Amino acid sequence: GHVKETKTWFQTLRLSLLSLALLPISLWAGVSDVQLPTGGSVTVGSAQVSQNNNTLNVHQNSQNVGIQWDTFNIGQNATVNFYQPNTSSIAVNRVLDSNASQIMGKLNANGQVFLLNPNGVIFSKTAQVNVGGIVASTLNVTDSDIISGNFTLKNQSNAASVENYGSVIANGGVVAFIAPTVINEGQIQAHNGVIHLTA
């Protein structure tokens, strides 16, 4: 027989910029193994948020939705699922927390997920992200951006970072980390997609 070629291509980035051992221990403090995002409030568009034990489900009804969260942390044994109308649907999650969002468990979505926290986003070694596409940033967008689908990331004054030490897989979309400091020591795969690490 002959070797069957796969049509999907992927990129794997392994950039060793900073040892995890150098991170202050306080960065990882305060998130339990079953921690889930809190205070989800839909600001534009339509979605329902429900929780079942250590799993949080977001059922998105509109093509684009904006959700404001008090905190957006996912513990090591916790899962957040976004069920979206299609692969190009966008869920914009804006986080009000004074601390960085810590993603230590599973984040799943069939569409595009924006995770915006001016104080940073950190994917730990145990993070497993499997989405259509993901944007993690310390910048922000407006409700009108979400409605129009034309996103202009607005600058924030915080000198925070987006850091990945885990596994991030995007099936056909963009993986974009945008912050004053971007660190990737984990694995990023964008099947038929694009990877942007922008500081």
Regions flagged by a language model, labelled:
Residues G1-W9:
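N-terminal secretory signal peptides that target proteins for export/translocation
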Residues V3, L13, L18, L22-A199:
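Solvent-exposed adhesion/ligand-recognition segments of exported proteins
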